[in-house]
Amino acid sequence: MAFLLIAILLGLIFIGIPIGFSLMLTAFFTMLIADIDIITIPIQMFSGTNKLVLLAIPLFIFMGELMGATKVADKIINLARALVGWMRGGLAHVNVVTSMFMAEMSGSAVADAAVMSKIFVPSMAKQGYAKPFAAAVTATSATLGIIIPPSIPMVLYGVTTNTSIKDLFLAGIVPGIILAAGFMITSYIFAVKEQYPTDTKFEPSNLGLAIKEALIPLLVPLVVVGGLIGGFVTPTEASALGVIMILIYGKFFDDSLSLTKIYELAVQTIRQTSIVMMIVAGSSILGQFLANEQLPQQIAEALMVVTDSYVLKLILINAFLLILGMFLHAAAAIIVVVPILLPVAVGMGIDPVHFGVIVCLNLGVGQQTPPVASVLLTVCSATGLGVGEVMNYAKWFIVSMIVTLMIVSFMPWTALLFL
């Protein structure tokens, strides 16, 4: 029955029903098929969303929206340009490094992609870069937003599995750096092949000036992530602190945030949060039912039948998560599937924190791969490019993501180094 419900969910998504409603309809089918008392559905929905730490999600989203409306992005881009703009394919590297910094402020790959696609794709095209290549770099580097802290998917993973969010944020640092390095290597190969130019000469004086101008914006992620890792604040308090700091900066340092603008951004945040929370509510019902059906035990037994090899089991789990990420929103995949796979992973000796990074990396690849491809489609929509022409370049960046995934999967120290 569990596999029937998963098939129903995927079928509803395929015919174009929004994933939040698809999850709700699947929950309704669950009630009919399993003869469950209807009152359990609202109870489980409330239970799945009635967690204080989930308040961090709208606050991190709001922080990203506020950041996009200020001049923070310009200062971060200038810093990235001074750091890596002198390399062959300079603007592509600037794009990646900027996404690393922006990931520390938004926690969302889609938010990063929406902002960066409007900035980098036109400017890279003007310097002679192929526009689809510029879009591919922008889309794939935005994935850093779900690995580098603060990461909204990691918050959801922590809530779902009762894993320390602080530890998850620490675990994302080294894999995030490896992932960014892979993107830069891929960009450099394309730059040499296509003879893309450098962006600027390296000047220590320019770097010093860029650091000085970006110092205040960079204090936001340092205080937010540093306070959380240091144990001074909870994830919810850290996200609220970040919002307050961005509001102060936008109002008093670059005068870019009026009350009207703040209201518009708040409304946009409410819309995005509503989508995420509907997914969380619907996923909690389906996830609970699948757990009650003892699906984790069934999967563990199936893996034992297929192979005794640890390596092959881990490859199969990664393959399953990769395919799942192509069809499901990250929030739904985490809430529905992680409670099923985590007992299997722990039984194999995988640390829950390490597994959280593996899950997020897999779902990051899924955000770039059709049919869902939420990040890729965001960039294509903003630039007017077709998915096919962007994928011609993006596929090589996706390969570098899979290489990073394999490194992190089979070298646990990359995720557990700071724990």
For the regions a language model picked out, list residue spans one by one.
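Alpha-helical transmembrane segments of multi-pass membrane transport proteins
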Residues: 1-419
